[in-house]
Each structure stands twice: as C-alpha cells, then as structure tokens.
Amino acid sequence: MALLCFNSFTTTPVTSSSSLFPHPTANPISRVRIGLPTNCLKGFRILTPIVQKPRKNSIFIASAAAGADSNVADGVEESESKKESDVVSVDKLPLESKLKEREERMLKMKLAKKIRLKRKRLVQKRRLRKKGNWPPSKMKKLEGV
C-alpha cells in the first residue's frame, strides 16, 4: 500500500480550468500560453503542457507491508516513471522558443517605429515653429496680412 502526501505549498493555482487536465496535485503538468504570430490566428492562444521541476518541500511517503502489498508499491513507482517519460521537456521544443523570440522582436520593432515617427513629427513641428508656420490655425489668421 502506498500513501502519497503533497505539501499544500507545492500546488500552483491554475487560472483556467479544463476538463482535459486534472488538478495540479494529481498531474505535475502546467500550461504555457504561446501566441502564434499568424494573421489568421490573431488573438488565439494555444496551451501546451510542460514538465514542472520537482520541489524540495514536497513529501513522498511510501509504506509497504510484506507480501503482495510490496508489489503494489512497485507498480505505483513504475507508473510514475512512465508518466514522466511521456511528457516532453522544454529543451526539446525549439519551435516555441523561436516563436517567442520572433514575437518579442516584432514588438520591439513596432515600438522603435512608433518612437521614430513621433520624433520625426516633433522635429517637423520645431522647424515650422521656428519659421512661424505653426500652429496651422495661426496660418489662417495671417493670410490677410
């Protein structure tokens, strides 16, 4: 007979509940949101499972009696190792990191473009003020002079 006990501090809150993934204490899989930079999927997010690192403050207690109960405990440990091997690690998913880097690069480029255009408008205003042609409403008043 095996007894599994998890510390209450090890559970992580899940923001969106789904019937596909059970409670985090039963399954050590968390979800990561990935935004795809395609025009057809704009605004949609994809959830992918990743493995959590084992925490030091979790407690595992296994007590087995002699005889058939010891075989049951071994079966539990084997099933846990199978679950861990089925989950793909983050290192083996280069596509996600590439998409994330590309999205960050695009955001930086957009921000830099906004700054450049704003600076260009300010320089243009400064030159027009120097010549006395700014603000444009002032030019209408000076037409008759």
Swiss-Prot record:
Any one biological process term the GO annotation gives: plastid translation
Regions annotated as coiled coil: none
CC annotations in GO: chloroplast thylakoid membrane; ribonucleoprotein complex; ribosome
Region Disordered, residue ranges: 125-145
Annotated organelle transit peptide span: 1-63
Keyword Transmembrane helix: no
Family: Belongs to the chloroplast-specific ribosomal protein cL37 family.
Name recorded for this polypeptide: Large ribosomal subunit protein cL37
Organism: Pisum sativum (Garden pea)
